[in-house]
Amino acid sequence: MARYGATSTNPAKSASARGSYLRVSFKNTRETAQAINGWELTKAQKYLDQVLDHQRAIPFRRFNSSIGRTAQGKEFGVTKARWPAKSVKFVQGLLQNAAANAEAKGLDATKLYVSHIQVNQAPKQRRRTYRAHGRINKYESSPSHIELVVTEKEEAVAKAAEKKVVRLTSRQRGRIAAQKRISA
């Protein structure tokens, strides 16, 4: 089994999926992954569908130079956002795969959330483009490795009601003692 970037605290309650050497932009895919990190699986899938329909956008926080602004970024507190369709489709495929793996393990699909998602750079694929005056420039693509882990949410245990301990200052203690002496 391949090694993941994060180890699950409870492997019996989590499922994983990964894709290697995927021909999809590393920068766009990284921003897409960060947008859904920590989200519930159903919410993340619905959000990515809305991104494909241009109803919502992916916020670009790190790789955002020379990116246009859109009002759809306000939802996330940013001005720069995009709709990277190819990256969204690859991430959707991995989410679907992780959901199927979780179902095979017998996990409850309604309780799943994205506990870990990581995008790494794969080796560049090199080509060449021919320029004026007999020059040649490199023409590289930036593929990605994507890994994600979905985990079943655990039931939150309510804390026991703690007894409220009233702390009195020395002045308050003295006043109470004086009142007891007067009334006694």
Curated annotation (Swiss-Prot):
The record's keywords, sorted A to Z, are: Cytoplasm, Isopeptide bond, Phosphoprotein, Ribonucleoprotein, Ribosomal protein, Ubl conjugation
Origin, by domain of life? Eukaryota
**Which residues are recorded as modified (Phosphothreonine)?**
70
What name does this protein carry?
Large ribosomal subunit protein uL22B
Q: Which GO terms describe its cellular component?
A: cytosol; cytosolic large ribosomal subunit; preribosome, large subunit precursor
> Sorted alphabetically, which NCBIfam families does this protein's record hold?
uL22_arch_euk (TIGR01038)
Q: Which SUPFAM superfamilies match?
A: Ribosomal protein L22 (SSF54843)
What residues does the Glycyl lysine isopeptide (Lys-Gly) (interchain with G-Cter in ubiquitin) crosslink join? 46
Question: So what does this one do?
Answer: Component of the ribosome, a large ribonucleoprotein complex responsible for the synthesis of proteins in the cell. The small ribosomal subunit (SSU) binds messenger RNAs (mRNAs) and translates the encoded message by selecting cognate aminoacyl-transfer RNA (tRNA) molecules. The large subunit (LSU) contains the ribosomal catalytic site termed the peptidyl transferase center (PTC), which catalyzes the formation of peptide bonds, thereby polymerizing the amino acids delivered by tRNAs into a polypeptide chain.
In the record, what lineage is assigned to the organism producing the protein?
A: Eukaryota, Fungi, Dikarya, Ascomycota, Saccharomycotina
Membership in a protein family: Belongs to the universal ribosomal protein uL22 family.
Q: Where in the cell is it found?
A: Cytoplasm
Molecular functions per Gene Ontology: structural constituent of ribosome
Q: Which GO terms describe its biological process?
A: cleavage in ITS2 between 5.8S rRNA and LSU-rRNA of tricistronic rRNA transcript (SSU-rRNA, 5.8S rRNA, LSU-rRNA); cytoplasmic translation
Q: What else is known?
A: Present with 21100 molecules/cell in log phase SD medium.
Tell me yes or no: is Phosphoprotein among this UniProt entry's keywords: yes
Assembly and partners? Component of the large ribosomal subunit (LSU). Mature yeast ribosomes consist of a small (40S) and a large (60S) subunit. The 40S small subunit contains 1 molecule of ribosomal RNA (18S rRNA) and 33 different proteins (encoded by 57 genes). The large 60S subunit contains 3 rRNA molecules (25S, 5.8S and 5S rRNA) and 46 different proteins (encoded by 81 genes). uL22 is associated with the polypeptide exit tunnel.
